[in-house]
């Protein structure tokens, strides 16, 4: 008895399905990395402006919208980052906002080490941005409370 052979149309269907799945995962990761880099650069720029211009910069997250405000120059920048899933950063002025000064963020933080922002893709991939009390913006999780 000869072994069964796959019909060409089934083989093409399976290969197209695998290619579509690989493309979907690559596209999802690309969106996550693009939004991560955009948010990371936004926070680093806010910290740099606060440090070198000796001013206060307020970063507010309202859902998927991020607003950066410099009260001294009345400059406001608003951008949308669709993959923001959670902002875990509380200040004395309110929730979901980060206030950068030339000394960092500790002056307005409610928690000792700062907080984090989580970005989650459609397929569930996650990346975290941690902003600590000195205003340093790094990739990673918020440290556990001590």
Question: At which residue positions do the language-model features occur?
Answer:
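Glycine-centered recognition micro-motifs in short, flexible terminal segments and loops
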Residues: 1-20
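N-terminal helix-rich module
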Residues: 2, 21-146
